Design a protein with these regions (language model features):
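Signature for HUH/AEP ssDNA processing cores
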Residues: 1-79, 88-93, 145-194
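Metal-dependent DNA replication initiation modules
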Residues: 65-149, 161
Length: 194
């Protein structure tokens, strides 16, 4: 059971925080007031970065953050990916930390089954869900899992996101520290020695 908060609608303070990412925050807020059910594309890199994960794996990461860690900032789902809002600079630092952890790897790698994480930072933009949660979110549509509710939300940095990703991967995929067995090796039964 997850202790993730069930906040599906952004508060006015959260909307102001999201709008502060753009060049014209007042225009963004006015647009949202006119169309509260419309998603919007916002730039990353100044106020927040976004780490995108496949939705099931992302949910495991989110559960780790809330059950065993410090919690999370805003989190959204868009087109089968979970968008974890992170501290600015995370998109630049996290890929090197994942490489250090031997994340993903090639087809024969021991971590090949671990899903890729996409990092959106300076120069990137993401589609954020509508401010209102809506009564029934469409499957595959965008919605908030944890909507922004304050003008200055806490955002996890790259080390916290790495911590959650590694723990979620360990729970989801058995990663052995031993190399795969050689199928051509000759094995002798020594239990029946005389």
């Amino acid at each position: 059971m997850s202790s993730t908060p069930n906040v599906t609608c952004a508060t006015p303070e959260g909307a102001a925080w999201l709008a502060s990412t753009g060049t014209y925050p007042r225009s963004t807020l006015a647009n949202w007031q006119e169309h509260p059910d419309a998603p919007l594309v916002l730039p990353c890199g100044t106020v927040f970065d976004v780490v995108s994960a496949p939705v099931v794996f992302g949910r495991r990461m989110l559960d780790r953050l809330w059950d065993e860690g410090p919690g999370s900032g805003p989190v959204a789902v868009f087109r089968g990916r979970m968008l974890l809002f992170a501290a600015p600079g995370t998109a630049q630092r996290l890929p090197s930390l994942l490489t250090w952890e031997e994340w993903g790897g090639g087809h024969g790698s021991r971590t090949a089954a671990v899903p890729p994480l996409l990092c959106h930072g300076t120069g990137d933009a993401v589609t954020v869900p509508a401010l209102s949660g809506g009564d029934s979110p469409t499957p595959g549509g965008s919605r908030w899992l944890v909507a922004p509710d304050t003008r200055h939300p806490w955002l996890p940095g790259p080390e916290v996101v790495l911590w959650a990703a590694v723990r979620a991967a360990r729970a989801a995929v058995r990663i052995s520290i031993f190399p795969p067995a050689d199928q051509d090796a000759k094995v002798y039964d020594v239990s029946r020695r005389r």
